[in-house]
Structures are given as C-alpha cells and as structure tokens.
Amino acid sequence: MLHKKYRPNVAAIIMSPDYPNTCEVFIAERIDIEGAWQFPQGGIDEGETPLEALYRELLEEIGTNEIEILAQYPRWIAYDFPSNMEHKFYSFDGQKQRYFLVRLKHVNNIDLNKHTPEFRSYQFIQLKDLLKKIVPFKRQVYRQVIAYFRKEGYLGC
C-alpha cells in the first residue's frame, strides 16, 4: 500500500459576531472554482505553529484576523483530494488539518481583496444549512469536526 502525502493545513469555523445569539457560520466561494464554498483554510509554513498559520491565513484570505478563539479540534484530521483536483496541489494526496472554532469580532472588517483574492464572495449561513452548500469531498470532515465541538459543549447550536 502506498503511503499518502498530506499537506499540513489549518481551517477556521468562523461564527458570526452575534454567536451564540445566532448560529450563523462564515463560508466563502473559491475564486478559482465557481460554486465551491468552504471554510477559510490554508497551509502551515515551515516553522509556523497552527495558531500562527490560522492568524496569517485569516488575514490573507478574509482581510481580518480579529477573532476570539473558542476551541481547537484536538487532532489532525485528513481528507483526500478528488482525483480530478490532485494536479492543482502538486505532490499531495490531500490535506491534514487542524480546525479552530472562532467567533469573528467585526463583520465590517472582512475584505476579500486585501491580499491576492482567493474567494469571490462570502456569506453567513445557518449552521444547519452548511453541508448542503459545501463541496461534497469536505462534508465528512466538516460533519466530524462540528459534531466534536457540539459534543464537547463549544458549539451550542
């Protein structure tokens, strides 16, 4: 059996500033794949901790890293790229991720064009509607991480 190679990555489940009064989560549509909605995420640079990568990636991707960290998923969680996407990600078979549950402090600080844009648009949607909107190959990971945050009492909706 071949050993799979996964790119180290962080991902953020961003709750709206109104959480826990509302249960809305931030998702963004990739600029390179129309209709591909996901959480902000990105690679961990050499020598960088997952937390440092989280703050850097949020600033790069959504223009702000003004967040409150609510929880961190305790383990790496991996997913494979669909076979038709592997060519985009060099020699990796997929990504292994550290997930953070965060609350955004200010919606008006979001700026998808602050750096090189990775997303074309964003929205806050009800958490219960999330899996219908997300690309299929990420649904199982999202389901698992959200279930953990709920079970542990970090996510109350």
UniProtKB/Swiss-Prot annotation:
GO molecular function, one term: mRNA 5'-diphosphatase activity
Extent of motif Nudix box: 42-63
Keyword match Hydrolase: yes
Pfam family, one: NUDIX
Cofactors named for this entry: a divalent metal cation
EC numbers on record: 3.6.1.-
GO cellular component, one term: cytoplasm
Annotated Nudix hydrolase domain residues: 5-147
Keywords carried by this UniProt record: Hydrolase
GO terms for biological process, alphabetical: mRNA catabolic process
Keyword field contains Transcription: no
Source taxon at top rank: Bacteria
Function, as annotated: Accelerates the degradation of transcripts by removing pyrophosphate from the 5'-end of triphosphorylated RNA, leading to a more labile monophosphorylated state that can stimulate subsequent ribonuclease cleavage.
Family that this chain belongs to: Belongs to the Nudix hydrolase family. RppH subfamily.
PANTHER family: M7GPPPN-MRNA HYDROLASE (PTHR23114:SF17)
Protein name: RNA pyrophosphohydrolase
Gene name of this polypeptide: rppH
